[in-house]
C-alpha cells in the first residue's frame, strides 16, 4: 500500500482568530497571577484548580460590557464569574463551613464582612478521618488588590477568626480598615484551617492537605478608576505608589499587556499585506499554554502555630 502525504499547508490566521488566541492567552496569564497571589490559600488545591481558575477569568473577560474583543482584560470583565470560585473541590468551603456570610461596602467604601454565629460542632463539617484530630480552627480572610495594567498586586489586609472544637462564637462584623486604592480590582478569599493540638509545647499543627483545604473567593469588586493600557512595556517600577505601601506590593510577570500590544501590530500588518505577521512560524511563544500545576510547593501540613488568647 502506498501512502501519499502532501506537504502541510500554512495556516493563515484571520483577525478574529488572532483576537480569540490573544484573549485566551491573556486569561491564562491573569489566572496565573491570581493563583500566585493567593498561594497560601491555593497551596493545597486539587488537580483541576488551574484550569478552573483560567475558565472563570476567561468567562469574566468575555462577559465584558465595555471592552472590545482583543482590547479588553479583567478590568473590563464581569467579576461575578470569580465569586464563589473554589480552590479545592475535594473540600468545598461552601459545604465544609456551614456559616452565613455576606460581603459589602459601606458608605466610606470600606469592605465589610458580616459573619453569622458559629457553633464549631455543627457548623464545621469535617471528613471522618479528621474529626478526632482537629481541636482548633482558624478562618482567614485575605484581601488582595490587582492592577493588571500596571502589572502588580498588593496585599491589603488579613483578618482571622479563631475557634476551638467545642466553642460557639456570636455573629460579628469585620470592617477592613485599609485605604483601598481606586485603580485595583479587589478580591477577597476565605479559608478554613484545621489544627491538631500539641500538648507537649501548647502549640498546634496544621492539618490541611490536598485532601482537605476549604478555600474560595467570596467577593470581587471592580476597580473604580482603572488605568489605561500601557503603550509600551512597563518599567516594573513602583512609580506613583507611596513608599509606605512598597513592602506589600508584588511586581508580576503578567503577559496580558504585551499580548494586546502585539495583537495590534499583527492586525495592522495583516491589513497591509493580507498575511498575518510571522504566519509561517505562528509565533506560538506569545500565547502562554495552560499547564496543570506541578512542582513541589512547600508542604505546610503539620506546621506548628500558636493561638493568641482572646
Give residue ranges: language-model regions.
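Intrinsic structural disorder
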Residues: 1-11, 16-18, 25-26, 35, ...
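Charged linear interaction tracts used for macromolecular binding and regulation
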Residues: 62-232
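Short beta-strand elements
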Residues: 156-169, 177, 198-310
